UniProtKB/Swiss-Prot annotation:
GO cellular component, one term: cytoplasm
Keyword set includes DNA damage: yes
A GO MF term: DNA binding
Pfam families: GIY-YIG, UVR, UvrC_RNaseH, UvrC_RNaseH_dom
Keywords annotated in UniProt: Cytoplasm, DNA damage, DNA excision, DNA repair, Excision nuclease, SOS response
Subunit structure: Interacts with UvrB in an incision complex.
Domain UVR as annotated: residue spans: 196-231
This protein's name: UvrABC system protein C
Function: The UvrABC repair system catalyzes the recognition and processing of DNA lesions. UvrC both incises the 5' and 3' sides of the lesion. The N-terminal half is responsible for the 3' incision and the C-terminal half is responsible for the 5' incision.
SMART domains tied to this protein: GIYc
GO biological process, alphabetically ordered: nucleotide-excision repair; SOS response
The GIY-YIG domain, residue ranges: 14-91
Length: 596
């Protein structure tokens, strides 16, 4: 804890609000909320913490806070700040499932479709469904009951669905708006739990048709009732009423939280969502934040009501979400919450062991490297490699590992601009200079360690750029390879010396992985550039094929190989004039003969 933090801790107010933790670059790494800011923020810098929280605290160099007038204001502000800053320690680890939904489109002639994407498009969404089959079967049922249009574009004449009684044919008839409105209201009622009411209506229609001796019509109503029973009976009943609700339960172990959400629709448990993530404040506060963020996702449609454990203040969530949030105290509803909680306890116990082992390997490997080199644990490592094809198409690549794991969104590729042909040192200087000028210009996070795929010379030119030109003091290490192109040594220091690391250690394994990854990334980019230039050079040699026609051919055929194999007719179908198609075809035929 530095002096700045000590001074700020002394003047913290005892009011609700949000706090923003910052690292040495001033980047916001965590946002939290508190009923009493003074107590919450001070707790981070006193006593001992779980490993995850200790890592967060070790990175805090400064903090800010915003006072609010109430806890609900603090929760809303926290959600907005997380959305704005996307701090790395506020990441929620979820199972990333996408669920199928039924959608009534917002069109002049609405359609009923299945989708896995929920958008803000004024359409009506219903779900989620446990799988595509369940959504499809429900859609088939509704198609028989409510004949909305099926075609994406209206055809010029009626289709088979009209003859099957499953479309009212807006393609040839003028359909009044109230007809659609009535159908949509009935479908909404059905999908929101009014199954029995729909069945009763069908039974009345069936009996009326039978009395009028319309036996085929009566049979159709009977089949529809049977189809409803078949579809609905495949789902397990967990509640005696048909209110749509989400049931939350959570469990905490060793600084990790598991939240399970049961989706109950029409009295049936149809699916669950499981999330496991590290926590850095009171479990109750973390749970409130989780629920708020859960319903920010468009695919999580708010139900009529939500059940949560008794330890949580439901009033805050009711105000935040605008729906009923209840804490059942007895009976079937409490049993549902208990079931979700029990499942969360089992999941966090089982998954925690796997997560802990992985953390030990990845974070442990970073710690081992830091200890061996005598530097702060390198949680952010940036590694560089150069590559070229016999001196041409020279490229460089950078990969980023955070907490011992690849952060692929932060990988970068570079075409060499200024370095001379075969000048590996010049290429390394160029890529280091370009990377860290941009880092300084844009205020991006600096690495804890720069890894160079190379030896002492490569390390020295990187140091000259970082320290002498840019004034940055960042540890630089080199990765040397043996005759078989495998990682053999870690070089570090000034002058560089070999750092002893067991080849079987997690630290050495991490270095191998980083070196293999940056080499793979560089080679892949090199091949892409080489193939691109090869394609350009072949087509550029054909008279009459300019940039536009070259692009036209590649877009149509996808590759030079397929252009080579194309017939004159196929070339004409790709938009080439007959005489040019003949010329291109003849060119590649001649090329083929010359190779034989």
């Amino acid at each position: 804890m530095n002096d700045l933090i000590k001074r700020k801790l002394d003047i913290l107010p005892d009011q609700p609000g949000c706090y923003l933790m910052k690292d040495r670059q001033g980047t916001i790494i965590y946002v939290g909320k508190a009923k009493v800011l003074k107590n919450r923020v001070r707790s981070y810098f006193t006593g001992t913490h779980e490993g995850k929280t200790q890592r967060l605290v070790s990175e805090i160099e400064d903090f800010e806070y915003i006072v609010t007038s109430s806890n609900i204001e603090a929760l809303i502000l926290e959600l907005n700040l997380i959305k704005l800053h996307d701090p790395k320690y506020n990441v929620m680890l979820t199972d990333d499932k996408t669920y199928p939904y039924l959608k009534i489109t917002n069109e002049k002639h609405p359609r009923l479709i299945t989708t896995r994407k929920v958008k803000k498009d004024k359409a009506k969404y219903f779900g989620p469904y446990p799988n595509a089959y369940a959504a499809s079967e429900t859609k088939k049922l509704l198609d028989r009951l409510y004949p909305l249009r099926k075609c994406v574009q209206l055809p010029s004449k009626v289709c088979l669905y009209y003859h099957m009684g499953q479309c009212i044919a807006p393609c040839v008839k003028e359909i009044e708006g109230h007809v659609y409105q009535e159908m949509i209201e009935d479908m909404t009622k059905f999908l929101n739990g009014g199954v029995e009411a729909v069945k009763k209506e069908l039974e009345v229609k069936m009996l009326a048709a039978a009395e009028n001796l319309e036996f085929e019509r009566a049979k159709e109503f009977r089949d529809q009732i049977a189809h409803i029973d078949t579809v609905m009976q495949k789902q397990k009943i967990v509640s005696s009423d048909t209110t749509n609700r989400d049931v939350f339960g959570y469990a905490v172990e060793k600084g990790w939280m598991c939240v399970q959400v049961f989706f109950v629709r029409q009295g049936k448990l149809i699916e669950r969502d499981v999330s496991i993530f590290p926590i850095y404040q009171d479990p109750e506060e973390e749970f409130l934040t989780f629920v708020g963020r859960f319903y920010e996702k468009p695919e999580h449609i708010k139900p009529k009501e939500v059940f949560i454990p008794q330890a949580i203040d439901g009033a805050i969530l009711t105000e935040l979400l605008g729906i009923k949030v209840l804490t059942p105290k007895r009976g079937q509803k409490k049993e549902l919450v208990d079931l979700a909680t029990k499942n969360a306890e089992i999941a966090v116990a089982a998954k925690f062991q796997l997560i802990e082992r992985q953390e030990e390997r990845t974070i442990g490997a970073c710690e081992a490297l830091g200890d061996a080199m005598g530097i702060t644990t390198p949680l952010r490592i940036e590694a560089f490699d150069n590559s070229h094809m016999h001196g041409t198409d020279a490229v460089s690549a950078m990969v980023v590992f955070i907490d011992g794991k690849p952060a692929k969104k932060e990988y970068r590729k570079y075409k060499t601009r200024t370095a001379a042909k075969h000048d590996d040192y010049g290429a390394m200087q160029e890529v280091i200079r370009r990377r860290y000028i941009r880092v300084l210009k844009e205020g991006l996070p600096l690495p804890d360690l720069v890894l160079i795929d190379g030896g002492k010379g490569q390390m020295e030119v990187a140091r000259e750029v970082l320290e002498d030109e840019l004034g940055l003091v960042i540890p630089i290490a080199g990765l040397a390879k043996d005759d078989k192109h495998n990682t053999s040594q870690l070089l570090f220091g000034d002058p560089p010396e070999v750092i002893a690391l067991k080849r079987t250690s997690d630290g050495f394994y991490l270095l191998q992985r980083i070196q293999d990854e940056v080499h793979r990334f560089a080679i892949t980019f090199l091949r892409q550039q080489h193939e691109k230039h090869a394609i350009q050079s072949v087509l550029d040699q054909i008279e009459g094929v300019g940039p536009k026609r070259k692009q036209q051919l590649l877009k149509h055929f996808g590759s030079v190989k397929k252009i080579r194999e194309a017939s004159e007719l196929a070339l004409q179908e790709a938009g080439m004039p007959a005489n040019l198609a003949s010329h291109i075809y003849a060119y590649f035929q001649q090329e083929s003969l010359s190779k034989e």
